[in-house]
């Protein structure tokens, strides 16, 4: 019988942020995926359709979506990846391409999930400096090594 080897991750717990602005109400936090515009009227109309069947899980392989994308952009259906948001795509890329000891270069003020999924895969996260809060290609190139797998 094979016993799984458990991994211990050195990850900081996510703490949903509260706004430091005390005197304002109805603050919209874009970093928490809140929308300033609310639900689209088109989405509301579709969801109000009584014929819409929401009692089943959606197609987890996104076959219809991938087929439409392949038709629209004239590309191979089997080379299209869909996910439940950018998180899932980042997770898939890290699981597919990273192993323990690999390096991932991310800008210092980038999306938190890049470093979380990299660490889960056992990779070392290397931060590149930004210049005036913009990604600097030259700073990224300085960090590239033989262990770099993802930038």
Language-model segment annotations:
Residues 96-150:
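PLP-dependent aminotransferase-like
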Residues 58, 82, 106:
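Conserved SAM-binding loop
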Residues 40-44, 62-66, 90, 114, ...:
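A general structural signal for well-ordered alpha-helical segments in protein cores
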Residues 64-103:
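Phosphate-binding glycine-rich loop
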Residues 26, 79, 124-126:
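Conserved beta-strand segments of alpha/beta enzyme cores
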Residues 1-56:
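N-terminal "arm"/small-domain region of PLP-dependent enzymes with the aminotransferase-like
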């Amino acid at each position: 019988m094979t016993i799984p080897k458990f991994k211990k991750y050195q990850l900081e717990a996510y703490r949903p942020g509260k706004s430091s602005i005390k005197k304002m109400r109805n603050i919209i936090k874009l970093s928490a995926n809140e929308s300033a515009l609310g639900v689209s009227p088109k989405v509301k109309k579709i969801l109000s359709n009584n014929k819409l069947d929401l009692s089943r899980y959606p197609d987890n392989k996104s076959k219809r979506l991938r087929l439409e994308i392949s038709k629209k952009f004239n590309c191979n259906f089997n080379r299209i990846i869909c996910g439940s948001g950018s998180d899932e795509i980042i997770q898939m890329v890290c699981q597919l391409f990273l192993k323990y000891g690999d390096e991932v270069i991310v800008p210092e003020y980038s999306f938190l999930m890049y470093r979380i999924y990299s660490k889960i895969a056992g990779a070392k996260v290397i931060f590149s400096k930004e210049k005036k809060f913009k990604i600097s290609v030259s700073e990224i190139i300085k960090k590239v090594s033989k262990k770099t797998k993802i930038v």
